[in-house]
Structure formats: C-alpha cells, structure tokens
C-alpha cells in the first residue's frame, strides 16, 4: 500500500512539474491589436521622443508614423520570439531634416529587427545579434 502511495505521489509531482514547464515554454506573444510609441533606440543621438514615431499591429499588418510619413506592411511575430516586418510602403511627404533623418533611422532598424519581447508595458525589438534596437512604450488607443 505504501508503495502505491509513493507511486501516486511521484506521478502527481511529475504532472505538476510538467504543467509548470509547459507554462514557461517559449510561446509567441501576439502583438495584434496593440499600439506603441517609440521611446528609445540605441544607434543615434536623436531622441525618438522628439518625434511622433508609432507602430500599430493588427491582423498581420504593422502601420504607424515614422516621424514624417505614414507606413504600413506585413509583419510576422513567431514562432517564439522571432520577428520580421516588411516590405513596408509609406507616404512620400517632405519634412524637416531632423525628422527625415529620424524616420530613415527608424525604418532601417525596423527592417533589421529579428526578435522581440513584450514586458512591463514595453515592446523591445532586437537586431540579428540580439542587441536592443527599438524600445516602445504601450500607447493608449
């Protein structure tokens, strides 16, 4: 009888451990129906907060404002933390030099993003080397 109790207890513990591990496995976090405002980037002395740079995700599409022009195109998040955006299309408005330079930097970094993480109200995109490149804060709808 004691042997069966130990077997049942071991099976119960194993089940709990497997459920915990399965819950911690890498799953794709959906970005659909979220909107973000760019807060930081790691490659320029220009401050993203000086411009309106946004990203909105819905139905497999990313759209937003790059600082001067609107943009849109397909994106893919997953499997796991994999990320890809593009090809992107945009309007062709002219703008002041700092804003057009910021937009160019943004478009380049967005196109180079290979993975992502959502945590603490922030969306972080990483380049191929795993370096943070674009850091957004969740925007209100």
Annotate the PLM regions:
Residues 2-141:
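Lipid interaction determinants
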């Amino acid at each position: 009888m004691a042997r069966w109790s130990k077997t049942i207890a071991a099976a119960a513990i194993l089940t709990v451990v497997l459920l915990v591990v399965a819950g911690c496995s890498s799953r794709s976090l959906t970005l659909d129906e979220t909107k973000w405002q760019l807060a930081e980037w790691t490659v320029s002395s220009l401050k993203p907060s000086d411009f309106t740079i946004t990203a909105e995700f819905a139905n497999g599409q990313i759209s937003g404002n790059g600082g001067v022009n609107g943009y849109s195109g397909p994106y893919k998040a997953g499997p796991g933390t994999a990320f890809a955006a593009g090809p992107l299309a945009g309007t062709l408005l002219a703008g002041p030099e700092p804003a057009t330079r910021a937009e160019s930097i943004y478009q380049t970094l967005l196109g180079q993003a290979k993975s992502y993480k959502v945590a603490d109200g922030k969306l972080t995109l990483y380049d191929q080397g795993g370096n943070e490149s674009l850091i957004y804060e969740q925007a209100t709808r």
